[in-house]
């Protein structure tokens, strides 16, 4: 229970930010899932991978996820994409 007006405002602001962060994190996860689904289906789509990487970068810049977390997830996605494109003749 907040004892001061500023503490009450902090609670409201934290709730808003948590919701915003949750929405952004969800967008990132969805983009990664779409890209991976395309890769595993045998139709690797560079545009989906690029979008997922862009969202990861933006989330890291905004402080929603740690920069190393974004780098690791981008690396793994790029590795899967490279493996799929090398395996499938275009």
From Swiss-Prot:
Q: Which domain of life is it from?
A: Bacteria
Q: Which residues cross the membrane?
A: none
The molecular function GO annotations come to: small ribosomal subunit rRNA binding; structural constituent of ribosome
Q: Does the keyword Transport apply?
A: no
Task: List UniProt keywords, sorted A-Z.
Answer: Ribonucleoprotein, Ribosomal protein, RNA-binding, rRNA-binding
Q: What InterPro entries has UniProt attached to this entry?
A: Ribosomal_bS20 (IPR002583), Ribosomal_bS20_sf (IPR036510)
GO CC list:
cytosol; small ribosomal subunit
Q: Name one GO biological process term.
A: translation
State the PANTHER family in the record: 30S RIBOSOMAL PROTEIN S20, SMALL RIBOSOMAL SUBUNIT PROTEIN BS20C
What family is it from?
Answer: Belongs to the bacterial ribosomal protein bS20 family.
Function, in words: Binds directly to 16S ribosomal RNA.
Protein name per UniProt: Small ribosomal subunit protein bS20
Q: Which organism is it from?
A: Roseiflexus sp. (strain RS-1)
